[in-house]
């Protein structure tokens, strides 16, 4: 395949879904992708501009960003974090205020991020030369109120919130902890605070007060502090917002196009004849499990459909603008610009939707159809179904039991999901890298050589996933016992302290 006609690199973003211990799948997939993209970026063929996600996806994203910007071998970093370290014992709360906590992880995360300071002989790779955007999806427990663009005193509210950052190459792990109270790492902990085990996490949003007000939010607290929980259930536009984070990094630089990669271990679809037919009555537990698996995936599916519609609308705007170019005079164009700017002045509208007085017809039509400032984006999904399109993801993922927390109880499950993620990302690279990334043969060879050299020695064992419930009873029971004992002890200490 020939090289891209434009000398500008392709913009790549990576969006990751939630999934608690299924972050091990993210870790394996990111290891393969970062290894391959780094090889391709050496030839200026691609540019990783942003990563992001919610919950486990947010934590995997910040690890990926650090590895990319600091030149740390991603296979080592992801394996160390997701397979070796992230267990229920590490997440067990100290004070007993909730079953789980990020306190121990916060104390030890720098040992993972800075292996050289621990005297570890970790293979270094060339670090990125350009900044990287980081998007973190959040669930705002207080809620955000805004005025509706209707007559009367109507108000709407949302609990969908987020943080975005621009991280610099070579700045070390310090940038992940600054500013205190609203740093990238603290935002990630807030996003990953699944209510099934973690207490809410607070963030100081004082520095973003003007941003909230510019976007019509009327319920900003005086001290600027909100409490947050796992952002996965309510994140409405995960892919689009990671693309927005990339735009902050690109900031006018040329790109030949845009590719949005989505890592989704829970990428569910219709399977066999399950949940069809009058005679095949599903059990209560089957319905509960199916619903729990579908809810996180639906937000990503909806966003991918939205981007597909935007792509079609962008193309239609271009065609209509070309057809009407000779029919729209300066006076009519000015009137249309005024209409757009009057609409974008509504409290609930984004401040950057306003048009300049010299905007052309294409920009006006784009604003009127909701695609102002947007560019066509290609989307690709990497999921366990790449390994077996006919299989249910529960047959492929080892750590999905116990509401996706099962992997935290058993390292074997995390390891298998890590290997599964690597295998699925490698399959995608083999099938789609040439087309989706627009790489020539020379760059492709460098990419595949790098991935092959970094590949783990093992392959995922699907028997581990199928037998995960029965084979993990002992480690889960043992770890659960320690967790319960720790929380009972914490409860007793608090009870005695109040007497």
Question: Where in the sequence are the language-model features?
Answer:
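Acidic, Ser/Thr-rich low-complexity intrinsically disordered segments
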Residues: 435-499
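P-loop NTPase catalytic cores that bind/hydrolyze ATP
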Residues: 127-143, 226, 233-240, 257-260, ...
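Active-site gating loop/helix substructures
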Residues: 132-251, 273, 278-308, 365-409
């Amino acid at each position: 395949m020939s090289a891209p006609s434009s000398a500008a690199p392709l913009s790549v973003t990576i969006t990751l879904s939630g999934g608690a211990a299924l972050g091990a799948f993210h870790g394996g997939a990111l290891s393969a992708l970062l290894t391959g993209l780094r090889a391709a970026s050496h030839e200026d063929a691609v540019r990783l501009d942003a990563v992001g996600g919610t919950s486990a996806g947010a934590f995997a994203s910040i690890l990926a960003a650090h590895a990319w910007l600091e030149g740390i071998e991603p296979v080592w970093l992801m394996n160390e974090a997701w397979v070796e370290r992230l267990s229920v014992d590490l997440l067990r709360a100290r004070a007993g205020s909730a079953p789980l906590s990020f306190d121990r992880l916060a104390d030890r995360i720098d040992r993972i991020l800075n292996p050289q300071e621990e005297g570890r002989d970790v293979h270094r790779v060339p670090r990125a030369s350009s900044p990287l955007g980081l998007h973190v999806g959040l669930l705002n427990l207080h809620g955000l109120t805004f005025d509706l663009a209707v007559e009367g005193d109507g108000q709407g509210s949302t609990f969908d919130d987020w943080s975005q950052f621009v991280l610099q190459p070579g700045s070390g792990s310090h940038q992940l902890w600054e500013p205190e109270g609203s740093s990238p790492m603290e935002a990630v902990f807030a996003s990953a605070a699944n209510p099934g085990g973690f207490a809410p996490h607070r963030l100081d949003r004082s520095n973003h007060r003007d941003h909230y007000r510019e976007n019509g939010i009327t319920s900003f607290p005086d001290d600027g502090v909100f409490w947050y929980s796992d952002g996965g259930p309510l994140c409405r536009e995960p892919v689009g917002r990671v693309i927005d984070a990339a735009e902050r990094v690109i900031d006018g630089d040329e790109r030949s196009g845009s590719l949005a990669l989505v890592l989704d271990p829970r990428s569910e679809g219709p399977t066999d004849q399950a949940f069809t037919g009058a005679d095949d009555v599903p059990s209560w537990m089957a319905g509960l499990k199916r619903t729990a698996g579908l809810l996180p995936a639906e937000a990503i599916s909806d966003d991918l459909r939205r981007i597909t519609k935007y792509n079609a609308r962008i193309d239609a705007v271009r065609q209509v603008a070309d057809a009407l170019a000779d029919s729209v005079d300066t006076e009519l164009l000015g009137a249309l610009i005024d209409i757009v700017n009057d609409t974008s002045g509504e409290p609930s509208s984004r401040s950057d939707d306003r048009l300049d007085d010299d905007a052309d017809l294409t920009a006006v039509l784009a604003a009127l159809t909701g695609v102002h400032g947007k560019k066509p984006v290609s989307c690709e999904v990497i999921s366990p179904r790449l390994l077996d399109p006919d299989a249910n993801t529960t047959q492929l993922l080892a750590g999905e039991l116990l509401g996706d927390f099962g992997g935290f109880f058993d390292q074997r499950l995390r390891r298998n999901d890590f290997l599964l993620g690597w295998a699925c990302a490698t399959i995608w690279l083999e099938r789609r890298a040439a087309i989706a990334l627009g790489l020539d043969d020379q760059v492709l060879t460098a990419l595949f050589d790098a991935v092959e050299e970094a590949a783990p020695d093992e392959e995922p064992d699907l028997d581990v996933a199928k037998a995960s419930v029965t084979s993990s009873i002992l480690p889960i029971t043992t770890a659960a016992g320690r967790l319960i004992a720790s929380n009972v002890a914490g409860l007793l200490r608090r009870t005695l302290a109040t007497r």
